[in-house]
């Protein structure tokens, strides 16, 4: 009854199996992909009927990690998985981006892809496995799809490209690049790098695309053996008569509208033209569908913009193809933040802040691959007012999470190591205006805010978004694209880096036929734009501030004997808790004896350091200490001499004369000098008052007040 069909092949250093026909047989297609014990189960369901009024392609990708895959039970209150985490959202986007452009234009049937991680080898990241699974399931489904695609991760270790490096290998890699494409074209690139050159990055993209052909070949072979019959789907025929009528009414007017450089004014004019043309046509013929008219108007807009660019005319806002919009760069714009910057590029603007915290502010991330601590956080917020809209506001959406991660990748390569700068750093980018490439504005703003905060980044970084318009062999690469150029163009190509090299590269291509030559032109043109932006940023701030903000916590580091850690912490944390309350500081202790004291007030930090030094100081025999009586017993008194250490003053060591009753000479809380006579093998301390006060008479203590009966 169950007849699994399996393809098994070698993929770099790993063995991959793709199996179908065993599970989820009511789904349109389902596969289990296994790469060296990391297994992802992927299903595809496509609806045969289009919903009434549907005017966009409803593709949904869900990626979910099950903790049982790693042999664990969820730590949440209900002990089950909840909403997708940030990592799962990013992988879902990674799967979606190369697949979406491969569905034919006009295909509006709902498609849902669900990828579930069911087994995980900590050395093999499930993201590539999930991408392969989604491609295979679509190839088997019969749904109209111009795939399959492959997927590969590329590392760069010892000046060599490495295919699908393990988690341990990635720790030593200067590159983490994911590339996906069809047999003939690259469609998607996502990467972070340690300031590599344009040539090294391009080489990695080509290497990854070449290597993933084995995946595409095996998916094609599996589809030939087990694939379902192709859907009998043809696109709706173009209503040429309606197209001509719309063009007659709107084409020249849209051309004039797209010469308006100011975004909101242009949008208002375009919307007015669309409304007038739609109303006029519906008045002439009530049987026409409004959605069809809008679709034709959209294609006319696209043709107007693209034809001008290809013919060498100025762009929508009057710029040449390689020009960057006007820049305005300011730092220190907010009085109480630790670092701030306002970065404006044309009609795109980001208000970016940097906040410094201690190690306990770091984010602990519990992932399927294991727990890790993140000391650098970058959050991106895109409120609706940034584009003049009144939309919903709430928790970050997929787009905001993805843009924030891209901006973080752009800055990560220049961040200082923990031993150089022991702070947790949080950067927040508030997009206050948007007309193209707000994520790259966030990179520029983050670099400026970090320098304003006194974070010793290795170099300033900037980001730029490139676009492409291509018809046949004719192509034009555009620098610093507008939102419209992104929407109407064939490629969105974002590059971030310093003067030395690239720190992040993201590429989304909507068409096939992007050659190595085109990517080379785009990278070189992006380098020129990046260097221009960096030169303008340098006029605002050249190097990181010499000192951190007066409002930021200052972290002072001292080293103690690891054997003394227990003394500083105390029983149940009593000593360290009392210390933090007494000094108003934050104290963190590492296993090697490193103690970090954070305080906004230098005097408080000094007080905390002196108290810790007292606690951890070695008691020296023969030395005199200031002490305080803590307990009185028949045979003497216990005296605290600092650092939580206590010693016994025997009754014979209180005074030069015979002492009959200890309470006649000492009271609890009384301060007195004591001399250390001996420390025995068990660490017990023997003290003497009479030797510490030799030559000074020890007076009897005043009688304790009698309680009234």
Curated annotation (Swiss-Prot):
Q: Which Gene3D superfamilies match?
A: GHMP Kinase, N-terminal domain, K Homology domain, type 1, Nucleic acid-binding proteins
Q: Which Pfam families match?
A: KH_1, PNPase, RNase_PH, RNase_PH_C, S1
Query: What EC number(s) are associated with this protein in UniProt?
Result: 2.7.7.8
Q: Which reaction(s) does the protein catalyse, per the Swiss-Prot or TrEMBL entry?
A: RNA(n+1) + phosphate = RNA(n) + a ribonucleoside 5'-diphosphate
One GO molecular-function annotation for this sequence?
3'-5'-RNA exonuclease activity
GO cellular component, as recorded: cytosol
Q: Which residues bind Mg(2+)?
A: 486, 492
Its needed co-factors are: Mg(2+)
The processes (GO biological process) annotated in the record are: mRNA catabolic process; RNA processing
Record keywords, A-Z: Cytoplasm, Magnesium, Metal-binding, Nucleotidyltransferase, RNA-binding, Stress response, Transferase
> What family is it from?
Belongs to the polyribonucleotide nucleotidyltransferase family.
Q: What is this protein called?
A: Polyribonucleotide nucleotidyltransferase
């Amino acid at each position: 009854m169950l007849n699994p069909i399996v393809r098994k092949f070698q993929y770099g250093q790993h063995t991959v199996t793709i199996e179908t026909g065993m599970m989820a047989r009511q789904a349109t297609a389902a596969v289990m992909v296994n790469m060296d014990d990391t297994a992802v189960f992927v299903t595809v369901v496509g609806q045969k009927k289009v919903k009434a009024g549907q005017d966009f392609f409803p593709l949904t990708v869900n990626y979910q990690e099950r903790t049982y895959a790693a042999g664990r039970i969820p730590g949440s209150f209900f002990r089950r998985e909840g909403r997708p985490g940030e990592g799962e959202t990013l992988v879902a986007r990674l799967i979606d981006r190369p697949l979406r452009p491969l569905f034919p234009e006009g295909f509006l049937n709902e498609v849902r892809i669900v990828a579930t991680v069911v087994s995980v080898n900590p050395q093999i990241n499930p993201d590539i496995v999930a991408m392969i699974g989604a491609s295979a399931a679509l190839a088997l489904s019969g749904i109209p799809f111009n795939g399959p695609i492959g997927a590969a991760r590329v590392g760069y270790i010892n000046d060599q490209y490495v295919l699908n490096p393990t988690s341990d290998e990635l720790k030593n890699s200067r590159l983490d690049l994911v590339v996906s494409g069809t047999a003939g074209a690259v469609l998607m690139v996502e990467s972070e790098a340690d300031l590599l050159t344009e040539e090294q990055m391009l080489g990695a993209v080509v290497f990854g695309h070449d290597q993933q052909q084995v995946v595409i070949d095996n998916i094609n072979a599996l589809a030939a053996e087990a694939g379902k019959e192709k859907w009998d789907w043809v696109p709706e025929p173009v209503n040429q008569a309606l197209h001509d009528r719309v063009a007659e009414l709107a084409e020249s007017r849209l051309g004039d509208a797209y010469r308006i450089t100011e975004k909101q004014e242009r949008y208002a004019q375009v919307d007015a033209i669309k409304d007038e043309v739609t109303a006029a046509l519906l008045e002439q013929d009530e049987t026409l569908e409004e959605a069809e008219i809008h679709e034709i108007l959209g294609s006319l807009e696209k043709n107007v913009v693209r034809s001008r660019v290809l013919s060498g005319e100025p762009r929508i806002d009057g710029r040449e193809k390689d020009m960057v919009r006007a820049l305005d760069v300011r730092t220190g714009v907010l009085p109480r933040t630790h670092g701030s910057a306002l970065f404006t590029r044309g009609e795109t603007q980001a208000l970016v802040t940097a906040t410094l915290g201690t190690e306990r502010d770091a984010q602990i991330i519990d992932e399927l691959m294991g727990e890790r601590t993140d000391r650098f956080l970058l959050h991106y917020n895109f409120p609706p007012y940034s584009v003049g809209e009144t939309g919903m506001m709430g928790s970050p959406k997929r787009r905001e999470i993805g843009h924030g991660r891209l901006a973080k990748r752009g800055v990560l390569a220049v961040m200082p190591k923990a031993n150089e700068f022991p702070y947790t750093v949080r950067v927040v980018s508030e997009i206050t205006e948007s007309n193209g490439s707000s994520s790259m504005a966030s990179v520029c703003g983050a670099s400026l805010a970090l320098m304003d905060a006194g974070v010793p980044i290795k170099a300033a970084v900037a980001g730029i978004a490139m676009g492409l318009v291509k018809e046949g062999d004719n192509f034009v690469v555009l620098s610093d694209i507008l939102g419209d150029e992104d929407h109407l163009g064939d490629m969105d190509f974002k590059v971030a880096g310093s003067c030395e090299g690239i720190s992040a590269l993201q590429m989304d291509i909507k068409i096939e036929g992007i050659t190595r030559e085109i990517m080379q032109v785009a990278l070189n043109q992006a380098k020129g734009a990046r260097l221009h932006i960096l030169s303008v940023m340098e006029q605002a701030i050249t190097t990181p501030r010499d000192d951190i903000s007066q409002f930021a916590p200052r972290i002072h580091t001292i080293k103690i004997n690891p054997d003394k850690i227990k003394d500083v912490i105390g029983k149940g944390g009593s000593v360290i808790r009392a210390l933090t309350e007494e000094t108003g500081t934050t104290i963190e202790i590492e296993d090697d004896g490193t103690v970090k004291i954070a305080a906004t007030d230098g005097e408080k930090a000094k007080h905390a350091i002196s108290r810790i030094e007292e606690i951890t100081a070695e008691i020296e025999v023969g030395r005199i200490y200031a002490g305080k009586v803590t307990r009185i017993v028949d045979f003497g008194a216990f005296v605290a001499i600092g650092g939580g250490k206590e010693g016994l003053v025997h009754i014979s060591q209180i005074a030069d004369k015979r002492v009959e009753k200890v309470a006649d000479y000492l009271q609890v809380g009384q301060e007195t000098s004591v001399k250390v006579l001996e420390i025995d093998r068990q660490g017990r301390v023997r003290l003497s008052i009479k030797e510490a006060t030799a030559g000074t008479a020890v007076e009897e203590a005043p009688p304790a007040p009698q309680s009234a009966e």
